[in-house]
Swiss-Prot record:
Pfam families: Asp_decarbox. The keyword S-adenosyl-L-methionine does not apply. Its main location: cytoplasm. Binds 1 pyruvoyl group covalently per subunit. It catalyses: L-aspartate + H(+) = beta-alanine + CO2. Substrate binds at residues 57, 73-75. This is Aspartate 1-decarboxylase. Catalyzes the pyruvoyl-dependent decarboxylation of aspartate to produce beta-alanine. It comes from Fervidobacterium nodosum (strain ATCC 35602 / DSM 5306 / Rt17-B1). Gene3D superfamilies: 2.40.40.20. GO terms for molecular function: aspartate 1-decarboxylase activity.
Amino acid sequence: MMEIMLKAKIHMATVTEKEIEYEGSIGIDEELLELSGIKINEMVLISDVNNGNRFITYVIPEPRGSRKISLNGAAARLVEKGDKIIIMAFGLYSKDEYKSPKILIMNSDNTVKEIR
């Protein structure tokens, strides 16, 4: 049986920008995408720690090393600049192929504190 399991998580990232007049998406620093294994255009679940909002969007890249986490379009109405968010990507796995998720624990400046 195939099951939907957590593939990757960027924990406690800080929202650096929001742009309502945009097509939609979450922009994530390319370095963080590479470290987490989250792909461009991948569907992600976002949880805002400050206000409890949870929503689904897709990923676009932000410049490598910029430390940008930007929410765009309708999703930008659900967060504020400075909010702490959890970004989660999931995959469909068989019991035998699933190992464990890649988890990035973030500092407040969106540098990586720890990788699990």
